[in-house]
Swiss-Prot record:
Protein name: Bifunctional protein FolD 2
GO molecular function: methenyltetrahydrofolate cyclohydrolase activity; methylenetetrahydrofolate dehydrogenase (NADP+) activity
Catalysed reactions, as listed in the record: (6R)-5,10-methylene-5,6,7,8-tetrahydrofolate + NADP(+) = (6R)-5,10-methenyltetrahydrofolate + NADPH; (6R)-5,10-methenyltetrahydrofolate + H2O = (6R)-10-formyltetrahydrofolate + H(+)
Biological process terms in GO annotation: L-histidine biosynthetic process; methionine biosynthetic process; purine nucleotide biosynthetic process; tetrahydrofolate interconversion
Length: 297
């Protein structure tokens, strides 16, 4: 029988451990602080930011939110980041993507103090990840790594196909999977929009991680029996519902479930782990910057 992996349950377990570490820091006079910066009028981005701030508040992390009009200059955003870099009450900084077209994304990522880069996207932190000495692992790949471990899925010696090569998920996910140690030691193939015969690659995989942002691009015919399927995608598609749309992943859940040994749903799969690992990184940042030792889960 196929196991439907409950991301909410695993995320809650991790968050509970992070909350205990937050209590330890607070008892030593250190209140972890996360600053979110939104330079967009996009409703979905506003929702994501509010979810992250609410999660922080629930475990005692102080939230600081900065809203910048999408019409403002890049310098307005850079000035805000500079202020947050210098603020000792702020241990983590998250600029919600995407930013407007007139703002260079790379410059935004490089502007954040790497010690406060809790997304793990600053070039220094990317380099540390590739070198096997990560300071902050990117939240979604780290969450998937935790999810696989909690579900009892061993990656060592397994063939893993990552579908998608984004800087946010695909590339760091592949880097984590090939590294030495628990959650790594996998033989990893990265597929993308130019991959020939994607189905041939996915059928030969023990684990498929779908992160291409294409609705239901992977179905049961592209999987072998017993595969573990991790669906990172979250896509709005038109539907005959009250809202006029429904959320689907990059995997056709119903057909894939017939083949998979374990599979994540959308929503309720990877998403809760992404937020849990943001809290994890924020508390780790507070520990590193304050010198107060903690034992994260």
């Amino acid at each position: 029988m196929t196991t439907v992996i409950d991301g909410n349950e695993i995320g809650d377990q991790i968050t509970e451990g992070v909350a205990a570490c937050t209590d330890t820091l607070v008892s030593e006079g250190v209140t972890p602080g996360l600053a979110t910066v939104l330079m967009s009028d996009d409703g979905a981005s506003e929702t994501y930011v509010s979810m992250k701030q609410r999660a922080c508040n629930e475990i005692g992390i102080e939230g600081f939110h900065h809203q910048i009009s999408a019409d403002e200059s890049a310098e307005a955003l850079f000035s805000t980041i500079d202020e947050l870099n210098a603020d000792p009450a702020v241990h983590g900084i998250l600029v919600q993507m995407p930013v407007p077209d007139h703002v260079p994304k790379r410059d935004v990522l490089e502007r954040i103090d790497p010690m406060k880069d809790v997304d793990g996207f600053h070039p220094e932190n990317v380099g540390r990840l590739v070198a096997g000495n990560a300071r902050y692992k990117p939240c979604t790949p780290h969450g998937i790594q935790k999810m696989l471990a909690e579900t009892g899925v061993v990656t060592e010696g397994k063939d893993v196909v990552v579908v998608g090569r984004s800087d946010i998920v695909g590339k760091p996910m592949a880097n984590l999977l090939i590294q030495y140690g628990p959650g790594g030691n996998a033989t990893t193939t990265v597929c993308h929009s130019r991959t020939d015969d994607l189905a041939d690659k996915t059928r030969n995989a023990d684990i498929v991680i779908a992160a291409a942002g294409v609705p239901e691009m992977i179905d049961g015919s592209m999987l072998s029996a017993g595969t573990t399927v991790i669906d990172v995608g979250i896509n709005r598609v038109d539907a005959d519902t009250e809202k006029g749309y429904e959320l689907v992943g990059d995997v056709d859940f119903e057909s894939a479930k017939e083949k998979a040994d374990a599979i994540t749903p959308v929503p309720g799969g990877v998403g809760p782990l992404t937020i849990a690992m943001l809290l994890y990184n924020t508390v780790k940042a507070a520990s590193l910057q304050s010198g107060v030792d903690i034992r994260l889960p």
